[in-house]
Curated annotation (Swiss-Prot):
Gene3D superfamilies: 1.10.1420.10, DNA repair protein MutS, domain I, MutS, connector domain, P-loop containing nucleotide triphosphate hydrolases
Pfam families: MutS_I, MutS_II, MutS_III, MutS_IV, MutS_V
Source organism of this protein record: Thermosynechococcus vestitus (strain NIES-2133 / IAM M-273 / BP-1)
Name of the protein in question: DNA mismatch repair protein MutS
Family (UniProt): Belongs to the DNA mismatch repair MutS family.
CDD domains in alphabetical order: ABC_MutS1 (cd03284)
Length: 874
């Protein structure tokens, strides 16, 4: 049962039963006669009609309550008790679940992470002053991709909202992070590239135009697969949208209106119709979900996938860039190994650099130069790190100010960050890198805002904007006058107790206050005969009587009115202050980008310095030469000096390396190591090696291990073949291909035939720089037949009763895999090991593989193996 489709009676009742409640509760608001509901529930039902695909959280006193089918969903997802509320005399009890108002953010985060949209209905008038039903309105709509509240976001990850437009095999993609303002669009002609880009972005929500009648339905992860194009994985949250929002003319008009321009030429998407339509549809959705206050977006940026090193989903997964394959954890990933950033902005940017490596050598060199300058100056590094730790998330704070949702603490965080930036500008004044100089040239408005906010805000303001205490005394004369009047009235009340004790002779008389009755004079029952005539009885208690006087009520009324006026005035001045900041949101975000870049580069410099990385030389040829290369993650998990470095040479003689060696000897680690070094180099980082000269690579492909894909009914071997086909259909001579164990998921000789053919195709047709790890030692024959193939092995040291893995990659092919020895080390029973050795002897005696020379169907002289298997006697 989910909120994004109507519930059947049986589903609702079974949900109630599972939650241990009476299944007689009303759970469908659209199946109840509206006029029979209580006035509050009638209003709830009307709002639910307006927001049918969102969970409606309805403020009632100190709780946000949900009713009917939403209550069932909220109770299940948040593991709350499903209870009931009286719905009307003829209706009975309706399903209800509630959450305390102070826990709203925590519960909303859980629901959003589960893919739900949420509509927040708040009380917009004081219940004490309400005539009848308290006035309520939907004040916020949260969807997974439109969240602005920092409490609902992960600090070091973007929260992208994406929009996709499909036309045949062509596609358009736009994405935005409403919390940072980033807004980008692109288009392409291969849907596989679209899926790869979505995998890079990991959007929280994807907008998809559809002709289906259920517009605005939210498909939570894993739901509604039949409503998605087959290429789009159901692992994400999709929102179905009307195609009208994605029409070219409407999209162009909407974008021009948003950015106050007459043409989109300056944004680079004027002649990219699918990209333009996707961007326009995304803006339409934001206009709908943020009606009260538009989301401030940066200018639309158009990019091409051809600007960056392409990484398909399998490569990102196999290289464990942001999470491990084993358990999906961050620790053990490449990002974990290199992230030393001090700010959330820097963390997000480093992730983007890692997933979007560069092709432009000049851009790469600029990052390398900055890292080199930082590595050479320890005092600069220390000072930068100290300052960066004091800078808050400027990108998201600017977004909250621009959207009118920033509170006083947000502005205080900006104030403190601006002060730090002024100091930081002096630190980098004498640097040479453009990245560092971007912080030296601080716009004057930043220092002006720092002064303005410092003069206006108290040092540690409260988060609430409705209770005062935000603005500094002396900043606003009108506020000071109000405060003075309030202080005088408060002092009069403080003095009243002593005055009345003296006037009445009642030594135990006290002045008290309650929210219900206000200020009062308390007299014990034993002293009632001393009460003067001007006292007005207000309340009788067991041991005391409470009174008021006309003057006390007058002072109280004046005090409360003055306090209310003070709060209103203070809020008005605060809003003006927030608008001053909002007017500079784009400038603040530009500075934020510069801070993030310096933070990311400083972290990379720290890693390079303390892990012993070298500066790679990037070239435009096909050379891949690594001396003393190391795996950047594995070496950090081992004691210092334990990792065995290895060399790699491709592209200047051999294009394809056939890598053989025992199980568990480190072949897979070596493959990943080479891929990670190439990737780190193209993101502008130093690399874990003694030296490295690397030709720019346009794509990295990996096929390392495979498992059954139960969701699509594909076997391990079929998954392997699909991944291999993708590589052979997209790789070129500037690609890096890393293959591990092609053909092992089928019969031995079928697998060998496929492995031989794939290796031959890569070497002779594609000429990709390739490392081909295999246990098919017959592939070593390729090196004798093809000039651009070389054999390497991971060597071991053989002792009488064991082997020692040396983890060294040396020229030459191995003739054994030591699989039985690996089984022994893994703990297989001795009888099994002995029998395996007997069977191996028989296989070696009776099975032979001969290689016959013949013309290859792929061209010139390579050979294919001719396999003959004798009858085996076991």
């Amino acid at each position: 049962m989910s909120n994004d489709r109507p519930l059947t009676h049986s589903e609702a009742e079974s949900s109630a039963l599972r939650l241990g409640r009476n299944p007689g509760l009303q759970v469908r608001h659209d199946e109840v006669e509206r006029s029979l509901l209580t006035p509050m529930l009638q209003h709830y039902a009307e709002l639910k009609d307006a927001y049918p695909h969102a969970l409606l959280l309805y403020r009632v006193g100190d709780f946000y309550e949900t009713f009917f089918q939403d209550a069932c969903t909220v109770a299940r997802e948040l593991e709350l008790v499903l209870t009931g509320k009286e719905g009307g005399k003829e209706v009975g009890r309706v399903a209800m679940a509630g959450i305390p108002h102070h826990a709203l953010e925590r519960y909303c985060r859980t629901l959003i992470e589960k893919g739900y949209a949420i509509a927040i209905c708040d009380q917009v008038e004081d219940p004490a002053q309400a005539q009848g039903l308290v006035k309520r309105e939907v004040t916020q709509v949260f969807t997974p991709g439109t969240v602005l509240d920092t409490e609902l976001l992960q600090p070091r990850r973007n929260n992208f909202l994406a929009a996709v437009v499909l036309s045949g095999n062509h596609w358009g993609l736009a994405y935005a992070d409403v919390s940072t303002g980033e807004f980008c669009t692109t288009q392409g002609s291969d849907r596989a590239d679209l899926v790869a880009e979505l995998n890079r972005l990991q959007p929280a929500e994807i907008l998809l135009p559809t002709e289906a009648p259920d517009i605005n339905r939210v498909l939570r992860p894993g739901e509604g697969k039949d409503q998605l194009p087959p290429e789009l994985p159901p692992q994400w949250c999709y929102t179905l949208r009307s195609p009208e929002d994605f029409q070219a003319a409407a999209a162009r008009q909407r974008l021009c209106q948003r950015f106050q321009v007459k043409s989109l030429e300056g944004f680079g998407c004027e002649h990219l119709p699918l990209a333009l339509r996707a961007a326009g549809g995304l803006v339409a959705y934001l206009d709908e979900t943020h009606r009260q206050q538009p989301v401030p977006l940066q200018n639309l940026s158009t990019y091409s996938l051809q600007q960056y090193l392409f990484l398909d989903p399998q490569t990102r997964r196999n290289l464990e860039l942001t999470q491990t394959v084993r358990d999906g954890s961050f620790q053990g990933s490449l990002l974990w190994a290199i992230d030393r950033t001090a700010t959330a902005m820097g963390g997000r940017l480093l992730r983007r650099w890692l997933l979007q490596p560069l092709l432009d050598i000049e851009e790469i060199t600029a990052r390398q130069d900055a890292i080199a300058e930082l590595m050479a100056n320890s005092s600069l590094r220390q000072s930068l790190h100290r300052h960066l730790q004091e800078i808050y998330d400027l990108e998201r704070l600017a977004g909250r100010a621009g959207s009118g949702t920033a509170n006083a603490r947000d502005l205080a965080a900006l104030r403190d960050s601006f002060r730090t930036l002024v100091s930081l500008a002096a630190v980098v004044a004498n640097t040479s890198s453009p990245y560092l100089q971007a912080l030296a040239q601080l716009p004057p408005v930043i220092e002006q805002l720092a002064d303005t906010l410092s003069a206006a805000l108290v040092d540690q303001p409260p988060t609430s904007l409705s209770e005062g205490g935000i603005l500094r005394p002396g900043a606003y004369p009108e506020l000071d006058q109000q405060r003075q009047q309030i202080e005088q009235d408060q002092q009069w009340i403080l003095n009243l107790e002593a005055q009345e004790r003296q006037r009445t002779g009642i030594s135990t008389l006290k002045v008290g206050y309650t929210k219900v009755f206000g200020y009062y004079l308390s007299v014990s029952r034993a002293k009632l005969n001393q009460v003067p005539d001007d006292y007005i009885r207000k309340q009788t208690l067991t041991n005391e009587e409470r009174f008021i006087t006309a003057e006390l009520k007058e002072r109280e009324a004046r005090l409360l009115a003055a306090q209310s006026h003070l709060f209103e005035l203070e809020y008005q001045y605060f809003v003006q202050l927030r608008e001053q900041v909002a007017a500079q949101a784009s400038t603040i975000r530009e500075i934020a980008a510069a801070v993030a870049a310096v933070d990311a580069l400083l972290g990379l410099a720290e890693v390079a310095l303390y892990q012993g990385y070298c500066r790679p030389q990037l070239t435009r040829d096909r050379q891949l030469c690594i001396r003393g290369g190391r795996h950047p993650v594995v070496e950090q998990t081992l004691p210092a000096g334990f990792f065995v470095p290895n060399d790699t040479q491709l592209g200047t003689g051999a294009d394809l390396m056939v890598l053989t060696g025992p199980n568990a000897s480190g072949k897979s680690c070596y493959l990943r190591q080479v891929g990670l070094i190439q990737l780190l180099a193209q993101m502008g980082s130093y690399v874990p090696a003694t030296s490295a000269t690397l030709g720019i690579c346009d794509r990295i492909f990996t096929r390392v291990g495979a498992v059954d894909d139960l969701a699509t009914g594909q076997s391990t071997f079929m998954v392997e073949m699909n991944e291999t086909a993708n590589i052979l259909n997209h790789a070129g001579d500037r690609s890096l291909v890393l293959l591990d164990e092609i053909g092992r998921g089928t019969a031995t000789f079928d697998g060998l035939a496929i492995a031989w053919s794939v290796a031959e195709y890569l070497a002779t047709i594609l000429k990709s720089r390739t490392i081909f790890a295999t246990h098919y030692h017959e592939l070593n024959q390729l090196a004798t037949l093809l000039p651009n193939v070389a054999n390497y092995q991971v060597v071991v040291k053989e002792l009488p009763n064991e082997i020692i893995f040396l983890h060294q990659v040396k020229p030459g092919g191995a003739d054994r895999s030591y699989g039985i020895e690996a089984g022994r080390l893994a703990g297989l029973p001795a009888v099994v090991i002995q029998r395996a050795r007997e069977v191996m002897c028989q296989i070696e005696k009776h099975s032979r593989i001969t290689v016959g020379l013949r013309k290859s169907s792929m061209g010139d002289p390579p050979t294919a193996p001719e396999i003959n298997q004798g009858e085996l006697p076991f």
